[in-house]
């Protein structure tokens, strides 16, 4: 925001140079990015009166002017402007002066044979405009020739370009900065005196259908205004702030926005009436419908989105609320009656609306950060007073829809002991000490806070009442402590390190993620990273304002990206891509947006990566069990016990070669071979396997094994007793179900169950397969005998025959 020092001095007592003020504000947190000293722009430029103007004898487009600049003898100046004439007041750059905005030193010159002693200036040459059609002509002034023109053009000013942090919405106004300067320097505030305007006729119809998005809307009708240029003082203040003057009505709304931080907007009432027809109009606030259009004040036709909040007249859009008005109701030189809008719009709503159509304005910037809801009426009365003073007119009607929730007073308890503990020692005039209670009371009082002591001890506690204009960023005790430190001055604190330090560490979730990535890399997978933005296909979460159509939606899974990457690598003859990705996915959930962290992986090709020599020159494709073993190795490294069951829900995976992964009764995800149809569409090799799992339940299973205290168990020094078990099982019966039944029946003596053979073919009953398991029995205190093992082994055999339709072969 651009801060005029002259304007600031009218609001607060200020005895600092611009450089000192800039340093003070920067140290206090309102960073001053640039100091623009305009006083040098018109140094040596004075007010001159053109006594006579004659045509140049040797040039058709030049004039020879005699100009009174307050010296004993008038100056002869050759001028090329078409609008120069006798008896006008103009700015004259005298001999020896320097115009920094055009890098021109004024010297005696001879133009086409005529001597010229100075230059009559345009606003462009003085740095006040980019282009100019001629010299600047002052209105009749009661000033002698030779007077400096700097004060007349606002060039006796210094501009500070400040960049407030996002939490300091109050600093986006001149009054807010004046309050800050008063708190920092102790200067006296001189805010403009504002008288309340009473309106007896309160029958202007206002309908707000979205009270959360628009808690307050006030419309005020002012009739009989006379639109014209604003006075010089108002135009100069607007120009200093970087705002182009338009006319007195519009300039007043912009001026109040800059002064109080409250956006306003003026509608031409007669144009509103023409737009809606002969019947009376009612103002309203609602969200846009898909496909609605509105031409805004910048003459751009906007296609509106459902996120856009609109101001309507009889339900017809007339403005994008809080962002920009509509061209159809613009105030111009023919306007006689206006409707003045003053409103509170929700910051989040305005931010979404602004982004949806890629349009930002001074109003939207302030609404996004939050305006002071308690000073809305102050800004309204200020605008009405200025408008009736500068444009005439009479306030005749008003309407208000006010559903503001009463926040009440924000009271926060502040402990001096806590403040001193956090801030530490400071350098005082008498040496090193603590911030005193008197310092705290002085600083917070200067900030506009009210203080009530709760105790009179050496370390008192105060009940601090926060002013309304700071309630958005001062919400807790720590915020008050920060304000005390900021205004006391960071340069007064002692330079010492904290005495008590705490060892840092990684959060459990981050430890789990690191362990997961290490486990995946440990089994030979390469980590890849894809964009989280994808091309939409129908069910994705769409972006409101995407940069490109190809990246206009949030991904719903990771596997699609891995499949595409696998196909690209294969097409480039880079071989099979054995890779994994950890990332976040998004989905629609009953109007809300859900999100979760996922792990996905893909593998295929030959299972031997060292070459084809061991297979006699023939590659050996990866089998389903090879890929499953790779996934199990990851889970084993993570200490998670995962069970497998049949599944055919994912259309990308082979329905007969897909497993549902579960851990502690919670579904993790799926693993399987890619569907043949998908492989043909992508041109992939036959043996490609993939998995995708949700990480939250996996992390929970990892907490004890990986993130908690390790559980060490010694190896048994005694040998295991091995037994084989072969059976015929139906094809739909999974190995996981058989394994679970054996583990449950075997109890503590059964150490391991491993499938070592599967056969389908001749001598196997139709619809079945032959499975062979190796069972290992072991304990840690002795060697098991046949008498220990045989009863338990028979118990397992009986459990299988009772629970499943299997036929034992051994």
From Swiss-Prot:
Q: Where is the tRNA-binding domain?
A: 39-150
Q: Which CDD domains match?
A: PheRS_beta_core, tRNA_bind_bactPheRS
Q: Where is the FDX-ACB domain?
A: 716-809
Which SMART domains has this protein been placed in? Answer: B3_4 (SM00873), B5 (SM00874), FDX-ACB (SM00896)
A single GO molecular-function term is: magnesium ion binding
Extract the coiled-coil ranges from the record.
none
Catalytic activity field: tRNA(Phe) + L-phenylalanine + ATP = L-phenylalanyl-tRNA(Phe) + AMP + diphosphate + H(+)
Spell out the subunit comment: Tetramer of two alpha and two beta subunits.
The entry's protein name is Phenylalanine--tRNA ligase beta subunit
